[in-house]
Amino acid sequence: MSEFPEVGTPLFYGVFFTAVLLMVAADMFSLRKNGSHKVGIKEALAWSGLWVAVSCLFAGWLYIELAGNPVYGAAVAKEKVLEFFTGYILEKSLAVDNIFVFLMIFGYFKVAPKYQHRVLLYGVFGALVLRAVMIFIGAALVRQFEWILYLFGAFLLYTGIRMMKSEEDEEDLSGNRLLGVVKKIIPVGSEFHGDKFFTIENGKKIATPLFLVLIMIELSDVIFAVDSIPAVFAVTTDPFIVLTSNIFAVLGLRAMYFLLADVAERFVFLKYGLAFVLSFIGLKMLMMHWVHIPISISLSVVFGALGASILTSLIYTKKQVDK
């Protein structure tokens, strides 16, 4: 336990939530103004830089407020800002797994690039609420639904193997057994309807496959939050610092995804590296009670698989150009 006091005053929470709401509103306005579109690397870089800048400004404001308060002082201010940045960087690092799974989910369901922005926008907003609940309620909720990790781990492994073996032909979503389980709970149509999550068929309101993708995005973030949130609690037990560092890091997930997605389109064999990563993550979840795989090893496997697939792609495409 830290010797420093918690700093989650109503004022601090108010400033934090106001900053988040303003940024979310700006994101929503941008989507409404530009409509469904493919996010390019310049736009992704701009949003990534903006989120990092806002996070740094918040940390700077927090330091000034704490250092100028006689109850806390400079020592507490320095410690809390250090905890914030440590938690922020840790969450950003662990988010690598999320990004690759997002790529896998979009690839598996063959979601058009111009609709991915909308899915991730709502997916990230949902993730904020879910992560806040997990942070404040604690590990009890995670233990109660621990079986979800095994279920989704099996799904990830199955999807990774299937993607590695699949061709580029259109896939019949209605024939997928795993999706059939979800469809028994939520009526899901077999065809996409632009960027709509719901549509009307035969006089009944049903979900589109895009809504199913949104559900998978939400579930994947919840699963990986089981790793990342306890990791941040190892840095600090102050719920305000855990919440703020986690949320600011997650808000940049969408922009990070499009940075990687734009690169992925340029490498012909990258999908095999991503499929391997997906399978590895699935196995990691399935074996978590018997084999503990450190995050450092997980990231090494991720970057190793991606590096190998990218290098192979570069060699292959260079040979094609030279012919």
List each model region and its residues.
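Multi-pass alpha-helical transmembrane bundle typical of ion/small-solute transporters
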Residues: 1-323
